[in-house]
Amino acid sequence: MSDNHLQNSDKINRKGFFSILLNQIFHDEPKNREELLVLIRDSEQNELIDQDTCDMLEGVMHIAKKRIKEIMIPRTQMITLKLHHNLNECLDVIIESAHSRFPVMSNDNNYVEGFLIAKDLLPFMKQSANIFCIKNILRPAVVVPESKHVDRMLKEFRSKRNHMAIVIDEFGAVSGLVTIEDILELIVGEIEDEYDDEETLNIRKIQKSTFSIRALTEIKEFNETFNTNFSDEEVDTIGGLVMKEFGHLPSRGESINIDGYSFKISIADSRKVIQIHVTIPENKTPVLIEA
């Protein structure tokens, strides 16, 4: 008997084995995606698989139908660096945001020049800051359309060993970014690391009377934390309140005093305020906040 015949026979046997196994578990083979999802849920209810496995299988099924636009981080929430940033400016943004990868925008903020990985700055820590040029250490930017399917994006991340991609709209303008973590969380649920608490906190204590505030923090949350009475009738967020008081879009380093509270812009770009440092009056005691 030829080797090819044996191999074909082996494939048939294996196919038959898995068909028998599938029938034993599911009784009837699913004919479409919806039936397969029902069988997966039935298997969990019958304790053939546990809840975590069920959730992961459902996650795998669902990502094939989703597009990048549905899961991306919108441009308004992207934390970026600029091509003209010096070493200290880069470090300030990295430390404040606790991220490890950053899109680097052109000076006019219209194009992504590449990605900067925080660890690539380490060699410059022992050298003169004057020799630093962000353009020399940029990684190529991966660019994908909003319409790309999530499962295909995951395959591309894996095959090319990338972790982040810039998302563009139908006109070629930057509309957001997507990371491999965003996709994996659709399958396995929230992925937490040692920095996640810092990244998700809207209000974080950094010194005795100074706090780092996300610009998107709602005024209501700020009032509850610091026992203040800032109005949210015209604006909803602390970033909106600060911009309203400035009367313009403030730049990094600008500060303003509002009712005894000092607001200093710590991260901003040409379109929005991202992070703010707030120094509270000495006689004020906020609700307990993690340092």
Curated annotation (Swiss-Prot):
<dbReference type="InterPro" id="IPR000644">
    <property type="entry name" value="CBS_dom"/>
</dbReference>
<keyword id="KW-0460">Magnesium</keyword>
<dbReference type="Pfam" id="PF03471">
    <property type="entry name" value="CorC_HlyC"/>
</dbReference>
<dbReference type="GO" id="GO:0005886">
    <property type="term" value="C:plasma membrane"/>
</dbReference>
<dbReference type="InterPro" id="IPR016169">
    <property type="entry name" value="FAD-bd_PCMH_sub2"/>
</dbReference>
<keyword id="KW-0129">CBS domain</keyword>
<keyword id="KW-0677">Repeat</keyword>
<dbReference type="InterPro" id="IPR044751">
    <property type="entry name" value="Ion_transp-like_CBS"/>
</dbReference>
<feature type="domain" description="CBS 2">
    <location>
        <begin position="137"/>
        <end position="194"/>
    </location>
</feature>
<dbReference type="InterPro" id="IPR036318">
    <property type="entry name" value="FAD-bd_PCMH-like_sf"/>
</dbReference>
<dbReference type="InterPro" id="IPR046342">
    <property type="entry name" value="CBS_dom_sf"/>
</dbReference>
<dbReference type="GO" id="GO:0050660">
    <property type="term" value="F:flavin adenine dinucleotide binding"/>
</dbReference>
<dbReference type="InterPro" id="IPR005170">
    <property type="entry name" value="Transptr-assoc_dom"/>
</dbReference>
<keyword id="KW-0170">Cobalt</keyword>
<feature type="domain" description="CBS 1">
    <location>
        <begin position="72"/>
        <end position="131"/>
    </location>
</feature>
<dbReference type="Pfam" id="PF21917">
    <property type="entry name" value="NMB0537_N"/>
</dbReference>
<dbReference type="Pfam" id="PF00571">
    <property type="entry name" value="CBS"/>
</dbReference>
<keyword id="KW-0813">Transport</keyword>
<dbReference type="InterPro" id="IPR054115">
    <property type="entry name" value="CorC_N"/>
</dbReference>
<comment type="similarity">
    <text>Belongs to the UPF0053 family.</text>
</comment>
<protein>
    <recommendedName>
        <fullName>Magnesium and cobalt efflux protein CorC</fullName>
    </recommendedName>
</protein>
<comment type="function">
    <text>Plays a role in the transport of magnesium and cobalt ions.</text>
</comment>
